[in-house]
From Swiss-Prot:
It holds the Pfam family Proton_antipo_M. GO terms for biological process: ATP synthesis coupled electron transport; electron transport coupled proton transport. It comes from the Eukaryota. This is NAD(P)H-quinone oxidoreductase subunit 5, chloroplastic. It is found in: Plastid, Chloroplast thylakoid membrane. It catalyses: a plastoquinone + NADH + (n+1) H(+)(in) = a plastoquinol + NAD(+) + n H(+)(out); a plastoquinone + NADPH + (n+1) H(+)(in) = a plastoquinol + NADP(+) + n H(+)(out). GO terms for molecular function: NADH dehydrogenase (ubiquinone) activity; quinone binding. Coiled coil: none annotated. The keyword Transcription regulation does not apply. InterPro entries: NADH_UbQ_OxRdtase_chlpt_su5_C, NADHpl_OxRdtase_5_subgr, ND/Mrp_TM, NU5C-like, Proton_antipo_N. The gene is ndhF. Keywords: Chloroplast, Membrane, NAD, NADP, Plastid, Plastoquinone, Quinone, Thylakoid, Translocase, Transmembrane, Transmembrane helix, Transport. It comes from Hordeum vulgare. Gene3D superfamilies: 1.20.5.2700.
Length: 739
């Protein structure tokens, strides 16, 4: 076993040869390298597959032996100070290694098809391979300073990939926003690392955990300083994992290519913050105030992310806010000490969200021939609809991913989310209520995304489409805005006399000629692809979707309990995940109870599934064909018209829409307070520098010049007069100097 562990340091380095080869190829033989660019995908996938095999082998040994292996070598030695560099292999590391490598391989395969026609194909593979290397190095780090080194590399790669299409001003602005926002968290992380080094004298995890065990009994360390340093460490995780209030970079990060969006949201960037907290949980567990703060931030984030996803029209941004909300669940679980549930949800969410993002990329590819390559159009769900007829494989995989994230059994996210909900209710009813309500919201907005994209009819053909926003459905709101002039009401999402309906995306009453017009764009699947209608993507992009679908269907079973032998009070709880995550310290609430109550599990499951089904039902009523049926009933329409509360409900809808579509006004607040405030401060500084500092300097010089010009005419041009005045000046100077 130890023989295998000794070569674990190879795992983060395996993708590097391809990166270096592509770099040297572009420098030495650029023409040949670019002509053979598609070949470079194979070694990238191959080397990461080898890393995956190593990771699986290490994980099997962890499950069988539950041992921890650490190897260190000195990097810097100076008197009593020693900075070590090495790697740590434990259950947490092995889980993250498998997660990163499996998702990374599928994203690389998908990227070969998605980026095949892009001029930056090689550059993209260099960035994404280095991204994988950085994340693998981060999860195998053995101390805080090593984590910080790879932490910054992960941030750099995300900056390069978010701004991959840097010629687009929006993408350039998005990567800068992500970089600046994460600098806030990274600065806090660095201060926290330095603070704990000053307190403990070590950066190694094992030393920190040993000292943390003695904090409460000895009470020899300033608790305020320790809490402050722990808060600074947590600030780094807040920025990286897009937690409130440093979440604003995540939706804008969707300006990058879709494969990198999948990798960031599933296994790399946002997972780094959760990993850091999980790694340092034995340290945080000794600070109850920090644990309460972590759970509070997670609760706010999971609810805020769900509300902001309600009215988004961009398919990728809707999924981004979904990620933000699910990361809030993980943060809540860590804050209440539910270590296993947090990591379980990290695993299940990673595969489901990777499936959804890659599926959205397939949808975007199918829409681009119709609406163009601008993300404002190709990612706009207002222009989609009815895609189930044209891309059935993508539709099937996307549906399963949606149901998984909604918490429908027996899909992956059901098991992990149900565990978090149960533990949150046990910890605090306040957290339990918000987490449960958000679970219903999750089902609603996720099924909304599915229905807008695949349900109904293809809306882009309902008018004479053009590239201008004013003449397209781009400006049509799904939440009750008025219909722009020039748009035929027969072709608008469900309408009333005053405007577009709050939720529905279907036509309440479709005329016969309209159906014929829709039918003219429909052909049977399998016919020759044309640009008149969307079509399925190639096998290179479909294969990862099918593999991720298998993970979504079956990965949740690693957390299902099975009988480990009869006990006096019940049945002993044992899962593959719990055996895998056998911790050296029992710092989770759920692990302290070794018994599982089947009745309690069924009760909790029924409650969570009921919430999910209710959210799906509401979404179907507002977005599905059922809404059109009810809209056409004169009795219900007349009842709604006579209802005195209708105006109040409409106002509530508009307020919810404004809150969600404007991102909770948080971005506007940051722009006005920080961006405009800093710009105003720089303008004031510039005025002070040029007007005051430079003014004084230039004024002294100008005054000296003017005085000199006046004095030179006093002597009348005679040398004797100049000598006389010179002696007078010297005499006055000596008088004051000597006195």
């Amino acid at each position: 076993m130890e023989h295998t562990y000794q070569y674990a340091w190879v795992i983060p380095l395996l993708p590097l040869p391809v990166i270096m080869s592509m770099g040297f190829g572009l420098i030495l033989i650029p023409t040949a390298t670019k002509n053979l660019r598609r070949i470079w995908a194979f070694p990238s996938v191959l080397l990461l597959s080898i890393a995956m095999v190593f990771s699986v082998q290490l994980s099997i040994q962890q499950i069988n032996g539950s041992s921890i292996y650490q190897y260190l070598w000195s990097w810097t030695v100076n008197n009593d100070f020693s900075l070590e560099f090495g790697y740590l292999i434990d259950p947490l590391t092995s889980i993250m290694l498998i997660l990163i490598t499996t998702v990374g391989i599928l994203v690389l395969i998908y990227s070969d098809g998605y980026m095949s026609h892009d001029e930056g194909y090689l550059r993209f593979f260099v960035y994404i391979s280095f991204f994988n290397t950085s994340m693998l190095g981060l999860v195998t780090s053995s101390n805080l300073i090593q984590i910080y080194f790879f932490w910054e590399l992960v941030g750099m790669c995300s900056y390069l990939l978010i701004g991959f299409w840097f010629t687009r001003p929006i993408a350039a602005s998005a990567c800068q926003k992500a970089f600046v926002t994460n600098r806030v968290g990274d600065f806090g992380l660095l201060l926290g690392i330095l603070g704990f080094f000053w307190i403990t004298g070590s950066l190694e995890f094992r030393d920190l955990f040993q000292i943390a065990n003695n904090w409460i009994p000895n009470n020899g360390i300033n608790s305020l300083l320790t809490t402050l340093c722990a808060f600074l460490l947590f600030l780094g995780a807040v920025a990286k994992s897009a937690q409130f209030p440093l979440h604003v970079w995540l939706p804008d990060a969707m300006e990058g290519p879709t494969p990198i969006s999948a990798l960031i949201h599933a296994a790399t960037m946002v997972a780094a913050g959760i990993f850091l907290l999980a790694r340092l949980l034995p340290l945080f567990i000794s600070l109850p105030l920090i644990m309460s703060f972590i759970s509070l931030v997670g609760t706010i984030t999971l609810f805020l992310g769900a509300t902001l996803a309600l009215a988004q029209r961009d398919i990728k941004r809707s999924l981004a806010y979904s990620t933000m909300s699910q990361l809030g669940y993980m943060m809540l679980a860590l804050g209440i000490g539910s270590y296993q549930a947090a990591l379980f949800h990290l695993i299940t969410h990673a595969y489901s969200k990777a499936l959804l993002f890659l599926g959205s990329g397939s949808v975007i590819h199918s829409m681009e021939p119709l609406v163009g390559y601008s993300p404002d159009k190709s990612q706009n769900m207002v222009l989609m609809g009815g895609l189930r007829k044209y891309i059935p494989i993508t539709r099937t995989t996307f549906l399963w991913g949606t149901l998984s994230l909604c918490g429908i059994p027996p899909l992956a996210c059901f098991w992990s989310k149900d565990e978090i909900l149960s533990n949150s209710w046990l910890y605090s009813p306040f957290f339990g209520i918000i987490a449960s309500f958000t679970a219903g919201l999750t089902a609603f907005y996720m099924f909304r995304i599915y229905l807008l994209t695949f349900g109904g009819y293809l809306r882009v053909h309902f008018q004479n489409y053009s590239s201008t926003k004013e003449s397209s459905l781009y400006s049509i709101s799904l939440w009750g805005k008025r219909i722009p002039k020039g748009v035929n009401r027969d072709f608008v999402l469900s309408t009333t006399k005053s405007g577009v309906s709050f939720f529905s995306q279907n036509i309440p009453k479709i005329q016969g000629n309209t159906r014929n017009r829709i039918g003219s764009f429909t052909t049977s699947f399998g016919a020759k692809n044309t640009f008149a209608y969307p079509h399925e993507t190639g096998n290179t992009m479909l294969f990862p979707l099918l593999i991720l679908l298998l993970f979504t269907l079956f990965i949740g079973f690693i957390g299902i309990s099975f009988d480990n032998g009869g006990m006096d009070n019940g049945i002993a709880e044992l899962t593959i995940l719990s055996k895998w995550l056998t911790p050296s310290k029992n710092f989770t609430q759920e692990s302290s109870n070794s018994f599982v109550n089947s009745y309690e599990f069924i009760t909790n499951a029924i409650s969570s599934v009921t919430l999910a089904i209710f959210g799906l039902f509401i979404a179907y009523i507002f977005y599905g064909s059922a809404y059109s049926f009810f809209q056409n009933l004169d009795l219900i329409n007349s009842f709604v018209k006579r209802n005195p509360k209708k105006e109040f409900l409409d106002q509530v809808k508009k307020n919810i829409y404004s809150w969600s579509y404007n991102r909770g006004y948080i971005d506007i607040f940051y722009t006005r307070v920080f961006t405009l405030g800093i710009r105003g401060l720089t303008e004031l500084t510039e005025f002070f520098d040029k007007g005051v500092i430079d003014g004084i300097t230039n004024g002294v010089g100008l005054a000296s010049f003017c005085i000199g010009e006046e004095i030179k005419y006093v002597g009348g041009g005679r040398i004797s007069s100049y000598l006389f005045f010179f002696l007078c000046y010297v005499s006055v100077f000596l008088f004051f100097f000597l006195s």
